Every structure is written in structure tokens, then in C-alpha cells.
Regions:
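Bacterial Sec-dependent N-terminal signal peptides
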Residues: 1-23
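Low-complexity, Gly/Ser/Thr/Pro- and Asn/Asp-enriched, turn/coil-prone segments
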Residues: 23-55, 149-159, 165-166, 173-176
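Short beta-strands within extracellular/lumenal beta-sheet-rich domains
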Residues: 53-67
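Serine-esterase "nucleophile elbow" of acetyl-processing enzymes
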Residues: 143, 147-205, 218-232
């Protein structure tokens, strides 16, 4: 009996090891690589593989389960000088332009969070039709190599440490990983400023309110992926302010929904942070020098909920007003 139990335990351990190894990819980009397919689980994706002397951007995808992955890239080339920008999933900035001289190589590591709509056998995230084209809700982790002269020697993708801290972003178009140029948000740029011990998982989507974020099971997905000690950063109010239905309003429905975020995140042992809504670029018509307030009571309602519940607040509402006014009407 003990022998059988030992054998069964050994087989489970072996299966776990095989599963872990199956999520590790070590890719020599100097060798010919396949075109991505579900069957081979890795390869060039989205656009055709670059030609030998081409400076065209390219994508490389690997099939992995939901979670955090440590990506290590060696940038550079023996044949040319390089200027390489690295993005992940929906244009999530991981490395700003890296310059390498001919024959020079530089190694960088960062964490990429990958997800799918699946939560459990009875629940999925209710993504919008346009999100089906995104690189963020699929079976694969996608890397984009762009810049004036992309030069990539190797790519390694492996499961990140279980101790990796994840920062989950919840919000609207000012936070989302924007899919196409020239659109961008602070949520898809903030990844650039975190080291290889932190993952950013951006669950924001254009047009969402705090209520529609909850109704589409997006917070449920965050809660399913988070662990004790992780962070959830919420910026809402931009679209909530437009709601006119019964029960809507800064001090009623909006405040109620914010409390739900607080309670659910804390129940899982997470840390929640509020971000007051990004200002709209709406200058006064007379002088074109002062930003006009368009969010009504929503910033104050968020501040009040945060004060009452002991939630830290990032004052993006005030900072973006100063930012736009400092740049001026034309430059902003």
C-alpha cells in the first residue's frame, strides 16, 4: 500500500514538472522559427516573419496558461546596430527604445501577465465584440518587437515566481491597453516603470463604468487571479458621470459600487487604491488656458469613499489638470 502511495505521489510530481516545463520557451531568434499555430504553440504571429535585413516590426507568441511569466530578451545583432522597443499583449510597453551597437548585446527581464476570459466552469468575463480581436483575451502571450531597427537574439518565457506581486488595473479608456496607434493610456505605459518583481494586469476597457465593470464579471476575474498582498488600482468616474438611469449618481450608485470593490478586494487579502478620474482636455473658450470641470461630484464621491474606508488615493484628477494647463491648449 505504501509503495502504491509513493508511486502515485511520484507520478503527480512528475506530471507537475512536465506541466511547468511545457510553459517554458527558450527561443533562438537566429534560427528559423515557425509561424504560430495552436498546434505548435509558438512562433511568429500577426504579421509575416521579418526578412534577414529588414527593420520591420514583428510579433512572437507562445501558448501559455493564465498567469505571470518572466520574459528575458537578449537584444542586439552581430550584423547591425539596433534600436528596439518591446511591447507585450496590447501594446503594453515593457522596454523603451534600447540602442545597441553592431556586435553589442543587452539582456533584460520583465514580467508579463497573461489572461483569458475563463474564470471557472460556470463563469467567463463578458468581453465586448471588439475585444475578441485584442491580444489580451486569448490562449497566448504575445510580444511585439518594434522601433527603428529591431534586433533580437533570443527570447525566453518561463513561469514567474509565485511570490511575484501583481498590480491589477480596473478602469476605462484612460487606463486600458489601447489596441491601435496613436491611442494610448497611462495603464499601458506604467509597465515600463516596474522591475522584474512586479506584474501589471490591466483589466480596464473603454466605455466601462464601475457598475459595468462589475456586471461583466471583470472584478471576478481579478479576484480569481489575485493572491493575498496583491494590489488593485481603480480609476472610475469618467463614464459613470454620463449615466442618467434611475439610481445613478455620484453619491448613490457610484459610491455603492466603489464600496463593492473595496469589500471584495479586501476579502481576498488584497490592497486597493483609488485613482480620481483623468481630466478631459476641455479648455475654457474665452482664454483657452483653464481646464473646465466636467466630472461633477464624481471625484469628490471617490475621495469621500476612500476617506471613510481608509483607501489610499492617487489624485490624477488634479495632476492632469495641472499637466494640461502647463502644456497649454496647442501642445496638449
Amino acid at each position: 500500500m505504501k509503495t502504491r502511495k509513493f508511486l502515485f505521489t511520484s507520478l503527480l510530481a512528475l506530471a507537475s514538472t512536465v506541466a511547468a516545463n511545457a510553459q517554458t520557451f527558450d527561443v533562438d531568434m537566429l534560427k528559423a522559427q515557425p509561424v504560430y499555430s495552436t498546434e505548435n504553440g509558438q512562433g511568429y504571429d500577426i504579421v509575416a516573419a521579418p526578412k534577414a535585413k529588414s527593420n520591420a516590426p514583428f510579433f512572437y507568441s507562445v501558448k501559455v496558461a493564465d498567469g505571470n511569466y518572466k520574459v528575458t530578451v537578449v537584444l542586439g545583432s552581430k550584423k547591425k546596430a539596433g534600436k528596439t522597443v518591446v511591447r507585450a499583449e496590447n501594446r503594453r510597453l515593457m522596454l523603451d527604445e534600447v540602442s545597441t551597437k553592431k556586435g553589442e548585446f543587452k539582456t533584460y527581464s520583465f514580467i508579463v501577465n497573461k489572461r483569458s476570459p475563463y474564470i471557472n466552469d460556470k463563469m467567463n468575463v463578458k468581453i465586448k465584440p471588439r475585444e475578441k480581436d485584442y491580444f489580451t483575451w486569448d490562449e497566448k502571450l504575445t510580444l511585439e518587437f518594434t522601433g527603428a531597427a529591431p534586433a533580437v537574439k533570443s527570447i525566453k518565457v518561463e513561469p514567474a515566481s509565485a511570490e511575484t506581486t501583481t498590480v491589477f488595473l480596473c478602469g476605462n479608456s484612460t487606463v486600458v491597453d489601447q489596441f491601435t496607434e496613436p491611442y494610448a493610456s497611462w495603464g499601458q505605459m506604467i509597465t515600463r516603470w516596474f522591475g522584474p518583481e512586479v506584474a501589471i494586469s490591466n483589466h480596464a476597457e473603454s466605455g466601462l463604468t464601475a457598475g459595468s465593470f462589475l456586471a461583466s464579471n471583470r472584478l471576478e476575474k481579478v479576484l480569481a487571479m489575485m493572491k493575498k498582498g496583491d494590489y488593485v488600482i481603480c480609476e472610475f468616474g469618467h463614464n459613470d458621470q454620463k449615466e442618467k438611469s434611475a439610481g445613478s449618481g455620484a453619491w448613490y450608485n457610484f459610491s455603492f459600487n466603489l464600496k463593492k470593490f473595496i469589500d471584495e478586494v479586501r476579502k481576498k487579502g488584497g490592497n486597493i487604491i483609488f485613482v480620481t478620474p483623468t481630466q478631459r482636455r476641455m479648455f475654457d473658450k474665452a482664454t483657452r488656458s483653464k481646464i473646465q470641470e466636467t466630472h461633477g461630484d464624481y471625484p469628490d464621491a471617490m475621495r469621500a469613499a476612500a476617506k471613510r474606508e481608509g483607501v489610499p488615493v492617487i489624485e490624477l484628477h488634479d495632476m492632469t489638470r495641472t499637466f494640461f494647463e502647463t502644456l497649454g491648449y496647442e501642445n496638449s
